[in-house]
Amino acid sequence: MKAYESGIVTRHTAAPAGGGKLIVLTAPLTEIIDHAGYFIQMSMASLPMWLEGILNKKYPQWRIVEYNPDGAARYMPAGVRVLEASLLRRFKADDIVCCYPDDLAKFIGPDTRIVAVSTHNPLGVTFAAGVYTSIFGSSKQPINAHYARDMFAKIKSNPWRASYQVMVGGSGGWQISRTNAYDELGVDCVVEGRSESAETLALFDQALRGEKLPQKVDVHHPQNRDEIIFPDKRTTFGVVEMTTGCGRRCQFCVPDLNPQIDLPRDRILAHVRANVRDGNRQISLATEDMFIWGQVHTKTPFYFPNREALLDLYQNVVNTPGVEQHVLSHATIAPAVVDPVLIERLTESIIDKSPIHLPVLSTHPKKKALVPLVGLETGSVARAKQLMPSKAVPFPIDEWPSVVIRGLEILNRHNWFPAMTLIIGSPNETDDDVKATLDVIYEVERRELFAFFIPSIFTPLHDTRMEGTKGVTETNQLTALQWQLMMKCWKMNLRPGQASWWAPTVWRLGAIVLWAWKLRKLNGPGFTWPMFLFAGAMPEWLMAKMGKIYLGKPLTIKTRKELLKTIKPSMRQFVRADTGDIPDDFASSPAAEERRLFIELTPEFSSFNRTGHDADARH
């Protein structure tokens, strides 16, 4: 279908009639685009601005965007779409526009009273962003922060600036309030929280009355699924909200502070269809843990996945007419150990719609793979007990290394190769903690497993339980062991590129050149040998024998059957018999036996209906 036949135009030059829109919604261009794939957005959040040319060469058309016939943006981040839908409860559609930053001057006029911005990383201080920009030295500003500043400059310099107030929301708003960057960026008010709240609408009413907004406002998160708004328009990457909250109570996590809610199946699917209707061919269900959906506030603990409910939801999403691609969001690794059958059957349902190909790793006929985002964070049991004591439930956190290895075995077997985040330099981290994490990384390598390990320097994010704590803040503060952990992760991440001899060779040679030219002076004395490790300058065993690196000790990893035995007796009834490896003493549980007999005698019975709720009402 041609652009004009679908109502899509690729540029808009006409000025709006009248005095501009009453309310203008926007976001940085780097957070809006989706046609170049997920990789470019992740790169823009991490790479310094001076490396933008690399992305420009690989994706020369990344700035080209699509418009609706009226000049409004064809797609927007999900948060902006939720705000738009929330405002439409109070205001006329003709009073509101979502536009790209380059088109702000076409919609802002004397009648404009509010410009509302959603931004993820305006100052470049999220988990991964500061790490890789500071490694390279000359600029710590990542690409997406540059484009955020460019957007704010356009808003601040508009000739009608005196007529409107600028409100900022999104996950990066705290960066502005914490650094007091209001005047620098031309921001009047930072709003923390969701746009569905009555407080958010009250702020818009206040601004429209001409009243001065407070600099910072905290608004409430919806407390139940009925309060959450689903937009009816296309979102960037086809993001459709699936759950809020998580429930594992990690100290460093912002979303876990939100209520644990799984959203209704029918409303999720309706938003999927809305994305397809507006031209989207890719869908991603947004969640902090995909495996809790269908098991929130039921008679079964959320860390035992509702297999039938999840299969039903994902099958309906990928089989929606018009959906050509589906990308997984966040997950935890313990559920893979709890229910490997779920991983197997889910793979059968969704992998054919994955746009990700990993020829060196995948056993899929078309070399397709699934790459969810999974938190490893640390391999140290001592650190895990302090930072994330519930990360491994239903298994005890003492078994975290075994849960990670066994979970990764199950995932890899079915062509899941997760992107696993690690935190380096958290408060009170010791050399022993770093060694314990390296032990896990080397164990993954010894067992020929694979994950994309994404290390980042500790960032005490606003409103987390660790706000106000201090760990490593700059790369030149990293110890040699911490540098080794970072470089070992990135060396292992090169494995998917081993299909060609030249790609890893060029990368490693380039690393040595950068080290000799600049990086050895910028990143401290502990950087040199880890960089040689990354570049493959000499065998790791030799560097270890010289005392320059830590090689990682082999770990004793429990089998899945041994892990199942560590589950509390009261929880064993929720382990499904068809997953295998069931310990003998599980049979002694009366609840487990009752459950087993009931399922055997009721073939049509499924966990989709055994939650104790009416299935139609919930899903």
Stretch-by-stretch model annotation:
Residues 274-417, 424-426:
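Conserved SAM/AdoMet-binding glycine-rich loop
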Residues 79, 97-225, 230:
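Glycine-rich beta-alpha loop elements in corrinoid/cobalamin-binding modules
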Residues 39-70, 122-150, 300-305, 386-396, ...:
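A solvent-exposed, charged loop/short amphipathic helix patch at secondary-structure junctions
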Residues 3-22, 34-38, 72, 201-240, ...:
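N-terminal [4Fe-4S]-dependent radical SAM core
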Residues 177-185, 428-443:
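Catalytic cores of alpha/beta
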